[in-house]
């Protein structure tokens, strides 16, 4: 399923696909992601940024200056800025193709995107101490990193060099972070 989704998106099936979905605004800690990706550009991966926002042009400039995008040979690009996606089917395909979801935001208090990724067996790496980190058990259903470029890059390197831990965390994320509407309805009825 993952390989088929990668093929549909013209992404190499033999390299990890890293994903960020959300507003392209500084509050989401997107600069940290780009700078951390530059520190691990010697590793095989491709990062996909889905969304739009006031910081998108600056993000693209930073990525180009760091040699991550805008190369004359697009196959050397490590980052693609995909833009906004309105189609649920396309978004599902993107999450399915992804191997690791990047979400170091300390701005969000209960992001749905981490659970969306988990529902399609994509674990997340989040900032330790953020509200999102409260639902992540490091190495079990996702990954934690300090809110620092070097720490995030080191954590990415550790994860990317050990693809089997991504598989374990993907299974854990799907088992522990995903809840059906029926489960939620029962919980609401029990409380009220």
Residue ranges with predicted function:
Residues 59, 128-139, 143-144:
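Short acidic/histidine- and often glycine-rich active-site loop of Leloir-type glycosyltransferases
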Residues 60-85:
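Nucleotide-activated donor-binding/catalytic signature segment of Leloir-type glycosyltransferases, i.e.
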Residues 84, 92-98:
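Short alpha-helical donor nucleotide-sugar binding micro-motif in glycosyltransferases
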Residues 123-127:
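Short hydrophobic beta-strand element within catalytic cores of glycosyltransferases
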Residues 11-28, 34-37:
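Conserved donor-binding/catalytic core segment of Leloir-type glycosyltransferases
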Residues 92, 110, 114-119, 133-134:
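Short alpha-helical segment that forms part of, or immediately flanks, the ligand-binding pocket
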Residues 138-139, 143-149, 158-163:
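Conserved acidic donor-binding segment of nucleotide-sugar-dependent glycosyltransferases
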Residues 106:
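Aromatic "clamp/platform" in nucleotide-sugar-dependent glycosyltransferases that forms part
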């Amino acid at each position: 399923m993952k390989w088929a989704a990668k093929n549909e998106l013209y992404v190499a099936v033999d390299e990890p696909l890293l994903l960020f979905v959300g507003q392209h605004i500084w509050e989401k800690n997107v600069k940290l992601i780009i700078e951390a990706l530059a520190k691990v550009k010697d590793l095989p991966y491709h990062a996909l940024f889905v969304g739009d926002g006031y910081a998108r042009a600056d993000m693209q400039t930073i990525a180009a200056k760091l040699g991550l995008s805008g190369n004359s040979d697009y196959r050397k690009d490590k980052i693609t800025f995909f833009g906004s996606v309105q189609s649920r089917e396309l978004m599902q395909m993107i999450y399915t193709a992804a191997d690791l979801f990047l979400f170091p935001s300390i701005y969000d208090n209960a992001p749905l995107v981490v659970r969306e990724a988990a529902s399609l067996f994509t674990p997340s790496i989040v900032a330790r101490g953020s509200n999102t980190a409260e639902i992540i058990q490091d190495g079990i259903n996702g990954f934690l990193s300090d809110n620092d470029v070097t720490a995030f890059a080191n954590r990415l390197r550790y994860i990317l060099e050990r693809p089997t831990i991504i598989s374990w965390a993907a299974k854990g994320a799907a088992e522990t972070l995903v809840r059906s509407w029926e489960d939620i309805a029962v919980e609401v009825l029990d409380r009220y």
